[in-house]
From Swiss-Prot:
Entry's Gene Ontology molecular function annotations: 5S rRNA binding; structural constituent of ribosome
The keyword rRNA-binding is assigned to this record: yes
GO biological process: translation
Family of the protein in this entry: Belongs to the universal ribosomal protein uL18 family.
Domain of life: Bacteria
Organism: Azotobacter vinelandii (strain DJ / ATCC BAA-1303)
Cited SUPFAM superfamilies: Translational machinery components
Coiled-coil portions: none
Keywords: Ribonucleoprotein, Ribosomal protein, RNA-binding, rRNA-binding
Its job: This is one of the proteins that bind and probably mediate the attachment of the 5S RNA into the large ribosomal subunit, where it forms part of the central protuberance.
Protein's UniProt name: Large ribosomal subunit protein uL18
Gene Ontology, cellular component aspect: cytosolic large ribosomal subunit
Assembly: Part of the 50S ribosomal subunit; part of the 5S rRNA/L5/L18/L25 subcomplex. Contacts the 5S and 23S rRNAs.
Amino acid sequence: MSVKKETRLRRARKTRLKMRELEVVRLCVHRSSQHIYAQVITADGGKVLASASTLDKELRGAATGNVEAAKKVGLLVAERAKAAGVTQVAFDRSGFKYHGRVKALADAAREGGLEF
């Protein structure tokens, strides 16, 4: 595993531990070069309440690796989280920089009605 990935995972582990101590539902984001994924996970990490990604049927046909696709995923995960009864979440960026696609997803989720 590369040093860059190890440091990202170390940052992610530290923030997830803090979120688990606070016992809050978290919006977890993962990004790859072509896709972006978002999950709303319970405080104990045992259950996924809502999820969305660029691989979903509604979003698969369009471009998947850009900011516009991340915005659509953010709106979709917010809609599904509200349907599951979740309005407040902690944002887990999984060690990725809060910039570009990760930021676009977070902003769209806020627009969709989730409170961070």
